[in-house]
Structures are given as C-alpha cells and as structure tokens.
C-alpha cells in the first residue's frame, strides 16, 4: 500500500493525482534545486479513507445531485460538521503526527495547507478558496487544522466556485501539505510573464496573507526577461476600520522604503524563470523571505493576457493608474461598494469599485465587467481569480472609491493598469 505521508523531497511526491498540483509543483521545485520550505505531502487517499470511516460518501453525492436546494445545503453542512467534529482515524493520524513532531523537534512551528486535486490547475486555480493554518502550537491544534482543511472542500465559497466551473466536490478529494513555518520578514508573489513580456514581483513586509487577501497595495517591481529592473513602485499600507457604509473605511499611511534590494529582486526573477521552465508554462508564484533567504511557497499556472488597444473615445477622460491583473478590457457602470455587505447593489455588467479586493469578492466575477480596488496587487488571490475568468481588474488605485463617481461609465484596462471614467 502506498504511503499516505511522503516527504516533499522524494520523487513520489511529484504525483498530482495523489497529492494535488500544489504539493506536486512544490515538490518539483525543491527537487530541481529551488529553495522551498520542505515538509510533507499527505495523499488525498487519507481524506477518502476518513470520509468512508465517517459514512459520509452518500451525503457527499447529495450536495450537487439534489434538486432540493435546502436539502443540498443541509448535505453540505453535514459534510463540514462531520469532517470537523469527528476525530481523525488513528491509522491516518499517526503518520501525519510523525511529520508534525519532526517539524516541532527542529524548533519550527507547523503549517497545514490545502492541496486539493482540483486546485492549482489550468482553468481552476481555486486561489483563496480553501484554507491554510499557520503557527500551530500543539498536536491538538495540528489535528484540528487537518480536519478544517478537509472540511474546507465543502465551504460555501468553495462550492460556489465549483458550481461555476462545472465541478462536483464529491468527485475530488483534499490532499494536504505539512510544512515548517517560514518566519517571513518580507513576502509576496510574482508573475513569470506579463502581457508585455516582463516579469512582475509584488512584496510587502511580514507574512503574505495581507497581499493574498488584497489588504495592502504592495511594492511592485517589473523586470525584463534579461533580468533588468525596469520599474520600482513602493507600496502603501492601510490600517483597517470597521464597516463604514459610505465613510472612508481605511486610513492610509505610506509604507516607506522598498522591501527588496536589487539583488533580491534579481534572485526572484531567476527563480520564476526556472519555475516556468519546470512547469512548462508561465507561472504565478508565492514566496516568503526569512533570515536565511527567499523560499518559494507555491507555483500555479498563469493565464497571460494580450495588450489592449483602448477606444480613442476614452483617451480624453480622467484616468487613474494601478496594478494590472494582466488580462482584459471592459466597460460598465461604476458601482462603488464600501464593504462586502453592499455587494447586492452590483448588477450584471457593472464595474465594481471597492477598497479591499479580497477573495470573498470572487462571487461577483461571474457577472461584472471589471473590478477596481484601492488595495491589492497583481498577485492577490482575487487578481488570480479574475485572470482565470478573463475579467479586467486594476488594483492599488489610490482613492478610487472617492474619485470615481458611483453610476458613471468606467473603462478598465486590466493589461495596462488604467481606469478611466466619463464625467
């Protein structure tokens, strides 16, 4: 019987059919000599075995097969509760705990990350749709994180994403990654190829969740394919306040000097180049830098857009610049939204103008003409979801919610990173 828990450094771990593309790609990067955090991959068979032990297989089938929507929601809730509340079977828990103990014995804190079999694939990246758990302090927290990652396959957000991509959660499974925590001083993401043929790097101080969730406007560095730094734009950070309903929801402060020096930027550029060669296509990466240097955390396929030629009628109108998602051109009526509770105001064909571009906004990508956000960067999770759907998006646009009138006609160039509106 194949091992359920395999070190990422072993050849066996590069099998996406067992460990998911996220874990398999990470294993391939490390085995090719690129710096990664190391760790273990947990076979999706562990999830399937747990499901069978809990008697949840028929319940799983009912989520998408039931025509009764309340019953389908009940099935989904039963899946989440069953996976969260019931203990992990001992024969599954023991090899995972062995990996956890090895991490703790090294003096590091542990991390549990999702690696679903449908995740990080062309056309279904699932960016920000599942869960990762950091800084796990004891075995109880570790096993809770394992159960929560399994249950995340049945979250409302993940199920909504699957429904719009023609996927059924009952037909897939959740593999896992168990890793030591990278104590990030700086973290971010990168695109190995833009529509202009360049490489793009985002960076911010501290762990990468703020960039992924679109909560900061990160540093932006653009390199040509020879590795020459063409652009360097410092980021901005905001301090969040509660839902403001029309008032400014965030106060702004400048982040100061840039997060990476020229040598570190060049190093990341070379890492992205090698990752692209290994994956066989342009990639989007996530990375973190601790006291020992830069480590790659993830590499997923990247959809690259084509340069757009704007209609000349728009060139005479006011413009704002920001970080392009890298794909698309669209026009529509601006709908300025100050918090997620106002999303019901966004109608099909509107351009959503907001402050924070978090992955929870993924639900509107099915029907909007574009997205403009004051925070976020080209490597945020929502930008990744927008690229996947071909929705133009511009992030890190200062004062967009104040400058762009609600109801005005807006043009969004997701390749050039330009937003224009008619007065």
Regions found by a protein language model. Name each.
Residues 203-284, 289-290:
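Conserved catalytic alpha/beta cores of large enzymes that bind or transform nucleotide phosphates
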Residues 42-59, 225, 241-242, 277-316, ...:
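Terminal amphipathic helices with adjacent charged low-complexity linkers/tails
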Residues 57, 211, 301-306, 329-346, ...:
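Acidic, glycine-rich flexible loop/linker segments
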Residues 1-177, 185-186, 263, 327-339, ...:
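N-terminal beta-alpha lobe that positions the nucleotide/phosphoryl donor
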Residues 7, 28, 111-113, 125, ...:
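Structured core elements
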Residues 116, 180-182, 205, 289-291:
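Short, flexible loop/turn elements at secondary-structure junctions
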Residues 127-157, 183-242, 299-324, 370-372, ...:
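Extended active-site and interfacial segments that coordinate phosphate-rich ligands
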């Amino acid at each position: 019987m194949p091992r359920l828990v395999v070190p990422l450094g072993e050849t066996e771990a590069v099998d996406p059919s067992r460990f998911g593309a996220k874990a398999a790609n990470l294993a391939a990067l490390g085995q090719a000599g690129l710096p990664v955090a190391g760790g273990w991959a947990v076979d999706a068979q562990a999830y399937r075995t747990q499901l069978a032990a809990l008697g949840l297989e028929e319940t799983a089938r009912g989520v998408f097969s039931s025509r009764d929507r309340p019953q389908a929601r009940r099935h989904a809730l039963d899946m989440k509760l069953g996976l969260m509340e019931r203990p992990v079977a001992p024969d599954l828990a023991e090899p995972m705990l062995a990996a956890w103990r090895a991490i703790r014995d090294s003096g590091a804190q542990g991390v549990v990350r999702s690696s679903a079999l449908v995740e990080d694939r062309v056309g279904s990246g699932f960016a920000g749709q599942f869960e990762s758990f950091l800084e796990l302090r004891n075995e109880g927290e570790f096993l809770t994180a394992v159960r929560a990652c399994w249950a995340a396959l049945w979250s409302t957000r993940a199920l909504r994403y699957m429904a719009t991509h023609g996927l059924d959660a009952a037909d897939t499974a959740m593999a896992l990654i168990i890793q030591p925590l990278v104590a990030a001083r700086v973290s971010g993401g990168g695109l190995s190829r833009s529509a202009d043929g360049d490489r793009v790097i985002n960076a911010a101080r501290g762990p990468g969740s703020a960039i992924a969730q679109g909560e900061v406007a990160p540093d932006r560095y653009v390199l040509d394919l020879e590795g020459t730094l063409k652009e360097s734009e410092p980021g901005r950070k905001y301090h969040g306040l509660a839902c403001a309903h029309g008032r400014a929801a965030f106060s702004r402060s400048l982040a100061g000097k840039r997060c990476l020096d020229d040598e570190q930027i060049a190093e990341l550029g070379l890492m992205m180049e090698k990752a692209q060669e290994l994956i066989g296509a342009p990639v989007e990466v996530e990375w973190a830098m601790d006291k020992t240097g830069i480590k790659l955390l993830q590499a997923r396929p990247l959809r690259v857009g084509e340069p757009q030629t704007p209609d000349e009628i728009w060139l005479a109108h006011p413009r704002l610049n920001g970080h392009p998602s890298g794909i698309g051109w669209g026009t529509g009526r601006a709908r300025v939204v100050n918090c997620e509770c106002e999303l019901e105001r966004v109608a099909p064909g509107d351009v959503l103008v907001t402050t924070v571009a978090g992955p929870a906004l993924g639900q509107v990508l099915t029907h909007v003409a574009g997205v403009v956000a004051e925070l976020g960067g080209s490597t945020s999770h929502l930008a990744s979801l927008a690229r996947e759907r071909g929705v133009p998006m511009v992030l890190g646009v200062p004062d967009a919610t104040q400058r762009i009138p609600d109801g005005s006609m807006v043009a969004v160039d997701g390749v050039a990173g330009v937003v224009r509106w008619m007065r």
